[in-house]
Amino acid sequence: MSGNTYGKLFTVTTAGESHGPALVAIVDGCPPGLEISLADLQHDLDRRKPGTSRHTTQRQEADEVEILSGVFEGRTTGCSIGLLIRNTDQKSKDYSAIKDLFRPAHADYTYHHKYGVRDYRGGGRSSARETAMRVAAGAIAKKYLASQGITVRGYMSQLGPIEIPFKTWESVEQNAFFSPDPDKVPELEAYMDQLRRDQDSVGAKITVVAEGVMPGLGEPIFDRLDAELAHALMSINAVKGVEIGAGFASVAQRGTEHRDELTPQGFLSNNAGGILGGISSGQPIVAHLALKPTSSITTPGRSIDIDGNPVDVITKGRHDPCVGIRATPIAEAMMAIALMDHLLRHRAQNADVKVNTPVLGQL
């Protein structure tokens, strides 16, 4: 199966299935000398791991990462970094009844047609379990970006019909929803409790922000930074849409409103989301992700079996009623991986470029 590697100079390759023995990642291109520890990686993995609240899947995975190579005495060596996370709480018997059925809105049907064989246990390769390795790799990218003065942070901005206004970054890490507004948490909890009683699921929107990004990242024409970010973020399971900056709201804006005017003191707005002409402007890079409702629900759904016969499918097992609740660390990881790749690419070609024009911030 191709398509398992992301990046050009900083690359991340993952392998593994939901119910296999382990998940694996090879991270290549990280410069030598970066201080990195298991704790750096484990922090973000703990933010993503399942079973941390009643609102997520109750599959209990420690998600303890092992560094197999590329790090010596606490520093990267410049060689490939091998990462491993062992699966410890698989319940494959939950899926035996659907091995010859196609779950509605899952990858079962498309994997069957593409490969002629599929691992039906928990979705196999198509499961969001794979994203644990992205988060581990993304933690390396975040550590490197931090050494360059760049931070990547995310939060939930909408769950189902509930819009969540941004208040403080401090609130994001203090609740299970990654909500930036603590006053919204009781409403979110009540909504999820009712959703569970209804045996249904719901979608969400995640916002990711990168601050401290220097101007110049991005490679026109086909490797524009916004196109690369959309690629990276759209590769996350259940993501059905990505916006950069004002995104689809740009349709209703006029040019006098949408254009981000410049003054000697800084930009007056950031509708472009920190990217102009496919190249970073030095403003915060802002992206929004729309995630669909979880397809694995206990309410019967119409489908077919491998012979084309009509069937009703009830998906058993342990599933997230809203995949968006655990998606924030994944979105942060993919943005960080994309930005690190482009930072290294920019330095490889343009490290000696100097201009006298000041770098503007945002007012």
Curated annotation (Swiss-Prot):
Residues the entry annotates as binding FMN: R125, S126, S127, N237, A238, G277, K292, P293, T294, S295, S296, R318
Pfam families with a match to the protein in the record: Chorismate_synt
Reaction it catalyzes: 5-O-(1-carboxyvinyl)-3-phosphoshikimate = chorismate + phosphate
CDD domains for this protein: Chorismate_synthase
EC number, as in UniProt: 4.2.3.5
Keyword Transit peptide among record annotations: no
Cross-referenced InterPro entries: Chorismate_synth, Chorismate_synth_AroC_sf, Chorismate_synthase_CS
Protein name: Chorismate synthase
